[in-house]
């Protein structure tokens, strides 16, 4: 009930300033006493347990990557009731990302455009935060490549991050679908994807022996695929026996927001305008994968109805981020109560 008032204050700030403030506040909410108070205030139920990728999730609702890039606010977000939190995207080296301003609201469509460019403090910083977290759910770590790394050497960055994150992650996500790192999406196709996933699976097998535990690896894909590209991606994921696929990242399309303020800003569009596009990708992926690889649905979830649509389409877990900005933590509670 309070969130519409809070949102007015948040939306009076520039989007990135509002985000940074929220992260600082949620970092403070990691304090054990404040964390208990926040949990009591939000009163989110524990939800329905679900086992996916061999992991037991206390409920199927997660926080999407991009919200807590450096793992600074894991316990604060955890108090909202999430079953899992995906931190990152993180790269081997710290990097500033693209020039500001780089986040823009499309308020009338409940959308957000970002061209952040994987701004983060580096994988070592993030891993230290993951190690300190008290969150009782699953923590996923989303990994990417540095902007300065040539695409043809991109797999080196993913392997570097995999080595660093493996022992501390509930699962790891390979992000090859952000539109804001030049050339990154090339890694989704053909021999480039084949080569990358082969290297990642080999390293996963090695690390599983070293640490005596198997940490599942998912791949996050874009929504802007042709039919042929999607079929090819699904086939490659299946051949390499990937543990999961996240559908989807942000879109470069502006079909759903044409003519609106900030619609012409360069970057990836998320939120409600992505809702149907991401659900359709989930549906098509499910048809191709036939349940062999679990799908994590992400993109425009802002209520129980469209969350259910993604489950019906084939998603086993769900992630939210933009919907949280527009609707507040009450969204998490509603989804946790409703989604099985």
Curated annotation (Swiss-Prot):
Class of the enzyme per the UniProt entry, highest EC level: oxidoreductase
GO cellular component, as recorded: cytoplasm; plasma membrane
Localization per Swiss-Prot or TrEMBL: Cell membrane
Membrane topology classification: Peripheral membrane protein
InterPro entries with a match to the protein in the record: Aldolase_TIM (IPR013785), DHO_dehydrogenase (IPR050074), Dihydroorotate_DH_1_2 (IPR012135), Dihydroorotate_DH_2 (IPR005719), Dihydroorotate_DH_cat (IPR005720), Dihydroorotate_DH_CS (IPR001295)
Sites where the protein binds substrate: 69, 114-118, 175, 180, 249-250
UniProt KW keywords: Cell membrane, Flavoprotein, FMN, Membrane, Oxidoreductase, Pyrimidine biosynthesis
Catalysed transformations (reactions): (S)-dihydroorotate + a quinone = orotate + a quinol
Annotated CDD domains: DHOD_2_like
GO BP, one annotated term: 'de novo' pyrimidine nucleobase biosynthetic process
UniProt cross-references to Pfam families, sorted A to Z: DHO_dh (PF01180)
EC code(s) of this entry: 1.3.5.2
Transmembrane regions listed in the UniProt entry: none
Location of the active site: 178
HAMAP family: DHO_dh_type2
Family (UniProt): Belongs to the dihydroorotate dehydrogenase family. Type 2 subfamily.
Subunit structure: Monomer.
PANTHER family from the UniProt entry: DIHYDROOROTATE DEHYDROGENASE (QUINONE), MITOCHONDRIAL, DIHYDROOROTATE DEHYDROGENASE (QUINONE), MITOCHONDRIAL-RELATED
UniProt name for this protein: Dihydroorotate dehydrogenase (quinone)
Species name: Mannheimia succiniciproducens (strain KCTC 0769BP / MBEL55E)
Phylogenetic lineage: Bacteria, Pseudomonadati, Pseudomonadota, Gammaproteobacteria, Pasteurellales
Originating gene: pyrD
